[in-house]
Curated annotation (Swiss-Prot):
Residues noted as binding 4-amino-2-methyl-5-(diphosphooxymethyl)pyrimidine in the record, renumbered to the chain: Q41, Y42, R43, D44, K45, N73, T112, K142
Keywords annotated in UniProt: Magnesium, Metal-binding, Thiamine biosynthesis, Transferase
Protein's job: Condenses 4-methyl-5-(beta-hydroxyethyl)thiazole monophosphate (THZ-P) and 2-methyl-4-amino-5-hydroxymethyl pyrimidine pyrophosphate (HMP-PP) to form thiamine monophosphate (TMP).
Annotated protein name in UniProt: Thiamine-phosphate synthase
Gene that encodes the chain: thiE
Binding site for Mg(2+): D74, D93
Length: 211
């Protein structure tokens, strides 16, 4: 596995896509990073650009302080402006090749592949750094999402040479099964950010990758 691939392992925290005070978001993100998140993805589809840039810069600084990777969801231009480590793209977002041309060879680009291994193989061939499958469990973030079964992660781990991320309804009480099935990362939204003690929940999740 490449050096980038070695860094793509562990708890991958994703900010909730709901209106949130930037200081509250920053405080919760810092707690999650203290708890051991290795990556932090900023996802906000509703705020205006100035607010998103302000939040992204604050989160980027936190990641720098804690030695974590900072990823921006969808918005390649914003990722460039704030110096993010990379972007996460959905199937309907900017084509991977175009994003790579804008961000450069060193940027991390992840691709959502839902429950389809064929999409993951195509993403790998196109130069993706990781792929994400989900929803693994019922998700409050995307209640209508197609489910990705646990055996998919085992098959993906045997087939792909890039890291595999699991997303969708994951929390500390159910993450062990998908990690055992082959996920290199677990992307968690409400399972950390919506908890009374985000740091403690992040610590529980991060510890699952240390055994």
């Amino acid at each position: 596995m490449t050096e980038t691939g070695e860094r793509l392992r562990g708890l991958y925290a994703v900010t909730p896509d709901i209106p949130t005070d930037i200081e509250d978001l920053r405080a919760r993100a810092e707690a999650v990073l203290r708890g051991g998140a290795r990556l932090l993805q900023y996802r906000d589809k509703s705020a205006d650009l100035p607010r998103r840039e302000q939040a992204a810069r604050a989160l980027r600084a936190l990641c720098e302080r804690h030695g974590a990777l900072f990823i921006v969801n969808d918005d390649v231009a914003l990722a460039l402006r704030v110096g993010a480590h990379g972007v996460h793209l959905g199937q309907q977002d900017m084509p991977l090749a175009e994003a790579r041309a804008m961000l450069g060879r060193e940027a991390i680009i992840g691709i959502t592949c839902h429950e389809r291994l064929d999409l993951a193989l195509s993403a790998q061939a196109a130069g993706a750094d990781y792929v994400a499958f989900g929803a693994v469990y019922p998700s409050p973030t995307k209640p209508g999402a197609v489910r990705a079964p646990l055996p998919l992660f085992t098959e993906a781990r045997e087939t792909l040479s890039i890291p595999v991320c699991a997303i969708g309804g994951i929390e500390a009480d159910n993450a062990a099964a998908v990690i055992a099935a082959g996920a290199d990362m677990v992307a968690v939204v409400s399972g950390v950010f919506a908890r009374p003690d985000p740091e403690a929940e992040a610590r529980r999740l991060a510890a699952m990758f240390e055994v």
